[in-house]
Structures are given as C-alpha cells and as structure tokens.
C-alpha cells in the first residue's frame, strides 16, 4: 500500500502493479524517471482512455500513472499523488489547418493560447 498524502518516488512504484498509458511516446521518459527499464516493472495493464484506467484502479487492479486533474476523484475512493522528483511531459493540441470551429471550440482554443503565452 502506498503512503497517503505524500509524493511518490520511483522506488515506491518498482514492485507495485502499474497501469500505464498505451501511448509509447513517453516510455523513455518514464523509464528514465523510474530508474528502471519498463520491462523490469510490474505493468498489469495499459489504457487509451484514463477513465478506463480509473475503473481498473477502483477495482483494485493496480495504480494508474496519469496526468493530474484528468479524473474527478471527489467523492470517490480514488486519489492523486504527485511524483517526486516531478515528472513532466509535453502535450499537444492539433487540428486541421483550415478547420472551421464552433463558438465553444474557438473559445477553448483562445483560452489555451492565452494560458500558453503566460
């Protein structure tokens, strides 16, 4: 069982059942942070949608590695613990070059642009 209320270090996760993203773009970064090759870890499942990973965690299958605030944990048995040292990964938003957006999508992109310029 992982200690509640504190950040997780690589050694805390070495022998734990892990659920990781199916996307392979961050494997090298994760392995470097974990100080282990991914083949040395106890990976019990991978996911494409973090919501599906949350269902596996809720059933006690393992611990999902994911970005914070993707799953609303309020009122559930799930909780988020940050990594120490911090592990960061870039994220990208892409769209068609001449895409016509609805008002909501235009407002969303405008907010994203403002946030990334700060």
Each predicted region: which residue ranges?
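Beta-alpha-beta core module
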Residues: 6, 12, 51-100
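Residue-level "edge-of-site" marker
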Residues: 26, 47, 69
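Short beta-strand-to-loop elements that line the ligand-binding cleft
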Residues: 20, 39-52
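Extended ligand-binding regions for polar small-molecule ligands
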Residues: 94-118
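Generic structural signal for secondary-structure transition and capping sites
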Residues: 1, 18, 61-62, 117
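Secondary-structure junction motif
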Residues: 2, 10, 16-39, 101-105
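Active-site-adjacent beta-strand anchor residues
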Residues: 20-21, 46, 64, 94
